[in-house]
């Protein structure tokens, strides 16, 4: 007895089913997360300063990999949108990212928009050589100490480090900071 061919409706149904699975599998493959860097999120961004959150279990070598990826993006095409950073100089379409400063934290409270604004306000006060209140000075120190790493990009030059935010009043050699790369200051 010869085999009976599939009914056209069954054939269409199987084609739709297999096509759907193929589309879903292809979409999942194409939209998979980048596993070469640790998971991260942009907690907040104020102008050129970006607070990045990584999970608490992220190791220093993983954070170094993330910082080096930012360096690679800055060196290759100067467009940090692929790294979830909004343009820092949106008024200039030729150079959307003239300067980017990243601070990496494990504790999400330090990446909140209000916390970053408060830190930047204390930084502006300190830069103006005005006296900070005891509370604000303590907050500033704690914010800087809580950072796990940082990255600075300025017109194609970069600096990356592991450790707290460097205190400009103390030489970096005396701080608990590991400089990964630094070409901000020409040799």
Predicted regions and their residues:
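Hydrophobic membrane-insertion alpha-helices, especially the h-region
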Residues: 11-30
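Short linear motifs at secondary-structure transitions and domain/linker junctions
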Residues: 24-31, 75-81
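Mature extracytoplasmic domains of secretory-pathway proteins
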Residues: 56-143
């Amino acid at each position: 007895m010869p085999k009976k061919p599939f009914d056209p409706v069954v054939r269409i149904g199987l084609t739709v089913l297999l096509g759907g699975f193929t589309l879903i599998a292809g979409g999942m493959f194409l939209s998979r997360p980048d596993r070469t860097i640790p998971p991260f999120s942009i907690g907040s961004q104020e102008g050129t300063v970006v607070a990045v959150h990584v999970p608490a279990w992220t190791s220093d070598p993983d954070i170094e990999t993330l910082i080096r990826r930012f360096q690679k993006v800055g060196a290759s095409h100067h467009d940090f949108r692929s790294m979830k950073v909004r343009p820092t100089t949106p008024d200039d379409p030729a150079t959307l990212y003239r300067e980017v400063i990243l601070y990496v934290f494990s504790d999400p409270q330090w990446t909140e928009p209000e916390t970053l604004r408060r830190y930047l306000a204390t930084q502006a006060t300190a830069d103006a050589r005005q006296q900070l209140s005891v509370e604000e000075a303590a907050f500033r120190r704690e914010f800087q100490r809580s950072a796990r790493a940082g990255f600075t990009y300025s017109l194609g030059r970069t600096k990356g480090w592991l450790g707290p935010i460097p205190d400009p009043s103390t030489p970096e050699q005396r701080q608990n900071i590991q400089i990964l790369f630094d070409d901000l200051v020409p040799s």
